[in-house]
Design a protein with these regions (language model features):
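Cysteine-centered motifs
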Residues: 3-4
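Conserved catalytic or regulatory cores that recognize and/or transform ribose-phosphate-containing ligands
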Residues: 15-147, 152-361
């Protein structure tokens, strides 16, 4: 039931022209609330779907050279400390369009410091859900641990491309990694690329580091793997999918879409819209995790205008295809784009904070 000032309740038999007539007579701030209620109350959550899927590439494996991710493509040949770093260098120069979609866990280095993420595994599941492919080069203790976790998680294993160094098999003695996760993935027809490359291990100050044995064979290997990855990733890309409220990445994209439609939202507004209007349970802690992730992925940004507002970036084109409940209250052409443009005009006229946050004042 939607209420208007001095108008009582809007009856279920009122048609859209009646709403527009009422909008002209009530205050603008109330009009914003009315349009918000009409939009959210008529969404049929079970029938919405995902569009414009970002198709990120979540790339895991050995360490990279230094901490500055922007300098990956400037590393000197022969100075790589992991195969992952060498392949990233290759993609940045030979597959530039694909490289733009690469996600590195290092980009989220402050996840623990700011207590944005409950635990690393759940966070990686979220990132993997947003990706079209998860590339894991099995090199180093961290990558071995990720292989064990990723191989048994359906959300990740279906997208997993594993690159495995057979040089880890010494004198025919296979390890747990070989008999366990690798065999499990191959048995379930997942992509496992078996290669071999030399690694030089160094012990310094009680810490083990590694360098790649860079030679012509390794250079040819990097070119081969880069070509293989480009082909395999292209085969996994898709633009649409069914929405599920049980899938963290789908919920994350729903949050991004609400920010896109409403153009400027506070945290509590997002939580209210999802919990109370869409009837989806979402804890504030998890919502903050989604907002943190979306910000680091460049899909939203923050702006303080008295309160903190979350705004869409140019990369955020909306991710939800809405379906609305059948109702005589709505016109056939009612859409999220109509709501977005109408709300923007309302903000300019009578919402100083949002207009300022959006650079409209």
């Amino acid at each position: 039931v939607i209420c208007c000032r001095n108008r009582g309740h809007l009856g279920k038999d009122l048609k859209w022209p009646h709403y527009e007539a009422i909008f002209k007579r009530v205050g603008l701030m109330e009009t914003i609330n009315q349009l918000t209620s009409i939009f959210l109350n008529h969404i049929e959550v079970e029938k919405i779907s995902l569009r414009n899927l970002p198709n990120y590439i979540f790339f895991c494996g050995g360490g990279i050279n230094g901490d500055d991710l922007s300098k990956i493509n400037t590393s000197e040949l022969g100075e790589f400390n992991s195969l992952r770093c060498a392949i990233l260098h290759y993609l940045s120069s030979q597959e530039k369009e694909l490289y733009q979609d690469v996600i590195l866990a290092e980009k989220f280095h402050d996840w623990l410091d700011d207590a944005n993420i409950n635990n690393l595994i759940d966070f990686e599941v979220l990132l993997a859900g947003l990706a079209t492919a998860v590339i894991l080069i099995v090199e180093g203790p961290g990558a071995h641990a990720e292989l064990g976790a990723f191989s048994v998680m359906p959300q990740i294993s279906s997208k997993l491309i594993t690159i495995y160094n057979v040089n880890s098999i010494k004198n025919g003695q296979r390890t747990f990694i070989e008999w366990g996760p690798i065999k499990f993935l191959e048995k379930n027809e997942k992509i496992v690329l078996r290669h071999e490359w030399g690694v030089i291990y160094q012990l310094e100050d009680n810490a083990i580091s590694q360098l790649i044995d860079y030679n012509d064979d390794f250079k040819a290997l990097v070119n081969l793997i880069g070509t293989q990855l480009a082909k395999d990733i292209q085969g996994k890309s898709k633009k649409t999918a069914v929405f599920s409220r049980e899938t963290p990445s789908d919920m994350c994209l729903l949050v991004a879409d609400l920010v896109y439609v409403f153009s400027a939202l506070k945290l509590r507004e997002i939580k209210t819209y999802i919990n109370e209007y869409l009837k989806i349970d979402l804890e504030e802690k998890i919502l903050k995790e989604y907002l943190y992730s979306l910000k680091n992925l460049g899909l939203i940004k923050e702006k303080n205008a008295g309160a903190k507002y979350f705004l869409p970036t140019e990369k955020n084109k909306g991710f939800i295809k809405y379906q609305f409940k059948s109702s005589p209250d709505l016109p056939n052409n009612f859409s999220a784009n109509y709501v977005k443009s109408t709300l923007l005009s309302f903000y300019i006229k009578d919402d100083n904070e949002r207009a300022y946050a959006l650079g409209l004042r």
